[in-house]
Amino acid sequence: MSAPAPVPDVDGVLARASFADDGLLPAVIQQHDTREVLMLGYMDREALRRTLTTGRVTFWSRSRREYWRKGDTSGHGQYVRDAALDCDGDTVLIQVDQVGVACHTGTRTCFDADHLHPVTGARPAADEGPTP
């Protein structure tokens, strides 16, 4: 028999999280096994609390001004596998098991459609490090 999952210290996480002036925290959603970035959403304190305690990702919709869970209408759910605040506490990474597509356009990820073709840089060789 496996041990029950530990109960998260939600109050501690909420105290460490640094929400913006509008009360929101960017949430990067990533497929847990492939590390594919699926989408970016926003969470307020309650959405983050729900995400950490229910096993389903909950967002705050800035346009509709309401909570929503990916998959409640489409069936394309996001099931929490792990979560971490960044070093400043002002962004959260939620690793999920994505069922179906993540994007409302019907694509796997919200970042598939428009590649920007930036100028890319090359990492300097070991002997070409910064000049002292």
From Swiss-Prot:
Q: Which UniProt keywords apply?
A: Amino-acid biosynthesis, Cytoplasm, Histidine biosynthesis, Hydrolase, Magnesium, Metal-binding, Zinc
Specify which residues bind Mg(2+) according to the UniProt entry for this protein.
D86, D88, D90
Q: Mention any Pfam family matching this sequence.
A: PRA-CH
EC main class here is hydrolase
What is the UniProt remark on how the cofactor binds and its stoichiometry? Binds 1 Mg(2+) ion per subunit. Binds 1 zinc ion per subunit.
Q: Which residues bind Zn(2+)?
A: C87, C103, C110
* Pathway this chain belongs to: Amino-acid biosynthesis; L-histidine biosynthesis; L-histidine from 5-phospho-alpha-D-ribose 1-diphosphate: step 3/9
The GO biological-process annotations, alphabetized, read as: L-histidine biosynthetic process
PANTHER family, sorted:
HISTIDINE BIOSYNTHESIS BIFUNCTIONAL PROTEIN (PTHR42945), PHOSPHORIBOSYL-AMP CYCLOHYDROLASE (PTHR42945:SF11)
Record function comment: Catalyzes the hydrolysis of the adenine ring of phosphoribosyl-AMP.
Q: What is the protein's quaternary organization?
A: Homodimer.
The name this protein carries in UniProt is Phosphoribosyl-AMP cyclohydrolase
Organism of derivation? Clavibacter michiganensis subsp. michiganensis (strain NCPPB 382)
Could you read off the lineage of the organism from its UniProt record? Answer: Bacteria, Bacillati, Actinomycetota, Actinomycetes, Micrococcales
